Amino acid sequence: MTNLTDLGIAAIRDGVARGDFTATEVATAFNAAVEAAQPALNAFIVTTPEEALEAAGKVDADRTAGRPLGKMAGVPIGMKDLFATRGTQTTAASKILEGFMPEYESTVSQKLWDAGAGMLGKLNLDQFAMGSSNETSAFGNVISPWRRPGDTAPLAPGGSSGGSSSAVAARIAPAATGTDTGGSIRQPAAFTGISGIKPTYGRCSRWGIVAFASSLDQAGPMARDVADCAIMLEAMAGFDPKDSTSLDMPVPEWTANLDPDMRGKKVGIPREYRLDGMDPDVARSWEDGIAWLKDAGAEIVEISLPHTKYALPTYYIIAPAEASSNLARYDGVRYGLRDLPEGAGLQDMYAATRAAGFGPEVKRRILIGTYVLSAGFYDAYYTQAQKVRTLISHDFTNAFREVDVILAPTAPSSAFALGEKSADPLEMYLNDVFSVPASLAGLPAMSVPAGLDRNGLPLGLQVIGRAFDEQGVLNAGLALEQRARFSARPAKWW
């Protein structure tokens, strides 16, 4: 019999529906895999084996009774610890929220439970989703299941959704939720050889997700392949009146309309993404992707996104500005950590709580954000950044008059070793160079594994689409997936 932990969403759901195995057997297998891997990978902050089994039991009972099963029936997933889960600790990987038990469920997680999914646990991440390597978590680094051949140095799983990427790549979860503000689904997916999609801004509700940068944050799925991402995204997406930025649009049937035939489609190759000193393996992978989409029938068109060079500085003004505003609410009064020095007044308590609760990277971004929003600098920085953001969005609008999707690398390199870049925040921020532009424009974008580099580590290719055209992104992703035939898995060392 196939090892149940080798199965993805579609295989589990369909196998449970056919009676090949029970949802309880699947949950039991993944619970055991999580327990075995957690000490080495640290992918989870909290594990919830009982919740996975309870959800599985309901699915098995529904099947026995002949009741209809949901899109995710019998699939146990990892939930990024940015999503509020009723009665289960939600921390955003920060000490300031340690022990916080929400009395409500995020819209996205509730939709997944309604579709028949169960929860294996809350996944580790960069603190408040601020980071590209999962080194800023207050609960320890997540370790990638991948290693360079002959080398035991622990590698970064990407970030901020590093717990999600590590768990899916290590086969201890068939899928996981992620959030993407400037690349936090796509970059970790690329680093670990899995697929992940950031949908159009507003496609998935932000209600109940701990906010980082509210005009950028978007939830999405991370899974073994493109089809599994489509299935999970259908379950996650949908209008939510509790989120003022939610799109009041029906959820398309992305899975039923998956089609890798690219005939009649034009694929844009942005010349500004060809950076000086680009990693030769990344450049080769990009050329492979161009050839694969051409083979699938697409016409390749070189395009220009002239304001690309301003995307990173624009992002690192807007995102910290929004973060400094969002994180002002954490004061130790109603929930989470409270640091109350003896004889302290209210303002002293605020300062002590925030000093003890926030990590260095979060403090750095709060300081940057507060600075660019201050009276003397607001127009010089924040207002200018918003103007440039509009120009970047217009670049994409103009490009999509000529082409249907855009192909680019997901990240400028494969996974790096933990500690390799953490001493230099600016070097770490450069990891987002290919992913940030689509985020600023609110466009759907996904990463698909494309092969291995010279060190035997995964590389990802990124497909960017028009707003609301997740179907076009998924279809191009499927065309790449079928031609890349990526089947490499990390050698098990944990």
UniProtKB/Swiss-Prot annotation:
GO cellular component, as recorded: glutamyl-tRNA(Gln) amidotransferase complex
Catalytic activity: L-glutamyl-tRNA(Gln) + L-glutamine + ATP + H2O = L-glutaminyl-tRNA(Gln) + L-glutamate + ADP + phosphate + H(+)
SUPFAM superfamilies tied to this protein: Amidase signature (AS) enzymes
Molecular function via GO: ATP binding; glutaminyl-tRNA synthase (glutamine-hydrolyzing) activity
Cited Gene3D superfamilies: Amidase signature (AS) domain
Location of region: Disordered: 140-168
Keywords linked to the UniProt accession: ATP-binding, Ligase, Nucleotide-binding, Protein biosynthesis
Active site: 80 (charge relay system), 160 (charge relay system), 184 (acyl-ester intermediate)
EC number assigned by the record: 6.3.5.7
Entry's family note: Belongs to the amidase family. GatA subfamily.
Name of the protein described by the UniProt record: Glutamyl-tRNA(Gln) amidotransferase subunit A
Gene assigned in the entry: gatA
